[in-house]
Each structure stands twice: as structure tokens, then as C-alpha cells.
Curated annotation (Swiss-Prot):
Example of a GO biological process term: arginine catabolic process to ornithine
Lineage of origin: Bacteria, Bacillati, Bacillota, Bacilli, Bacillales
Effect of deleting the gene: Cells lacking this gene do not grow on arginine as a sole nitrogen source, but do grow on ornithine or ammonium chloride.
Organism encoding this protein: Bacillus subtilis (strain 168)
Protein name (Swiss-Prot/TrEMBL): Arginase
Gene responsible for this protein: rocF
EC annotation from Swiss-Prot or TrEMBL: 3.5.3.1
Summary of the function given for this chain in its UniProt record: Involved in the catabolism of arginine.
Cellular component terms per the entry's GO annotation: cytoplasm
Amino acid sequence: MDKTISVIGMPMDLGQARRGVDMGPSAIRYAHLIERLSDMGYTVEDLGDIPINREKIKNDEELKNLNSVLAGNEKLAQKVNKVIEEKKFPLVLGGDHSIAIGTLAGTAKHYDNLGVIWYDAHGDLNTLETSPSGNIHGMPLAVSLGIGHESLVNLEGYAPKIKPENVVIIGARSLDEGERKYIKESGMKVYTMHEIDRLGMTKVIEETLDYLSACDGVHLSLDLDGLDPNDAPGVGTPVVGGISYRESHLAMEMLYDAGIITSAEFVEVNPILDHKNKTGKTAVELVESLLGKKLL
């Protein structure tokens, strides 16, 4: 890839209840993201952080912090849209996973058939009716598919952003009942940890590449809780039995070799819950693999 990489920080923590994930972009930068990508030969521009207005935080009676989450994602969508218009590669740093609403709103308008790889322990397919918590970080994939609160679904004036047949979830091991029902009804492609253990990551990525081969762009949305908590402890909703560090690098390396990733976000790094920024460092190392770093 010869595009300029545009790094966008999104210090959003209002899509969930645990403080600290707003420091995720800083933790990833502190692990030398910009320097290490520059050392790989990339032109990197750091566009700073999207401002989050905390003075007007107000819990909607239906969804927690709806207005603030919506306002932040509107700004993010506009920033991502501009980066893509300039023919650059958007790399978004979270922040909780609700930021994917803005990333995809700014990205999908540039593609007729955008594919999405959702690398996550969770489905993030909840709605107000199915969510046990009301936290919007459990809803971004549903919202992007056109399901959920009207104001979120219609961000940037169009919906849906993506189609269920163009989504692959990798690493799922914690799904709510409503999410399981939607997956079965829609036929969405999901690789749970059972499939990853049985098939191996090489086969999973090979099948994913084949499945998304008709897409004209592919967005990677990587939640660090997709990894096992032993490898990525600094996340808000850890689930044991996750994808290993090495399996994750293999996945990123294969995606780079295929040349299909056109945008990416790395989310849910929470340095307050981390150990010596281990998860922030892991995020940087996975970005490097996604963008082509190899031993030889």
C-alpha cells in the first residue's frame, strides 16, 4: 500500500460504562504507533483526536449517552469521509466500539459493496430491545446494518451502510439471545472460537477472503477483546478463551498479503485496566502486521 496513513483518535468512552477507554488513542500512540509506521516507510499524518463534548452529557431515557455518542460519531464520520476523499488510508483509534458507527458512516458512502471484518469477542448486534445494558458499544454493527435507533442508523443521511451478507465476524464467544437470533435469520458469516479452534486461523482467513471477494472495499474493525485476555488484558469486556496473539498476527499478515483492507479501526484499549500498556503495544504490533511488517 502506497497511500498516506491518516491516524484519527476517537477518545470516546460514552458507549459503555467503564472509564479509561477514552485514553485508548493516547495509549496506542504512546506505544510508538506513528514512529513505527514511519520506520516501515509509510507517510503518516496524525490528525489528532476528535473532540468529545462532555459538558452536554445527558442520558437518553432509552440509550445511554445517546446525544453525546451521536455528536461524536458525526464528527468522526466527516473526518473519515475527508480522508478517503483525499485518497488516504483512515486508521481510527478508539475509544469504545460505538465509534464504528461513525467510521462506517464515513467510509461506506465511498463503496458500492463494502465488506466488513468484525474481529471481536462480541457480535455488537444489539438494539434497544435486545440489549441487556443499553450501552451503545454493543450496537454499532446492528446500527450500520440499518437496525436500531433512527438517529444512529441515519447518521450521514443514508442507511444501511452495509449488508449482512458482506460481514464476517471473527472471534465471537459472547452473544446475547437477540444477536444469535439475528445471525441465524440473516445468515451472517460468523466464525466463533469453536470454528477457529477446529479449522485454524489460516483456513478462517482464506474462507473470509473468498467470501468477501466481490466487495469493492473491506473495512477491518478490530476490538482488542477479540484476543484472549492473557494477551490483551486492558479491555472493558474481556472474555476468556479468545484468539491468541500469534493467531491474530497471522490474520493481519494474511489480510495484508491479500491487499483487501481499505480502512481500519482498533478499539477498546483501556489503559486503566491494562498492565504496563501491554494492550496498547499489542494494538500497535497488530497494526504493523496489517500494514505489512514481516520478519524477513
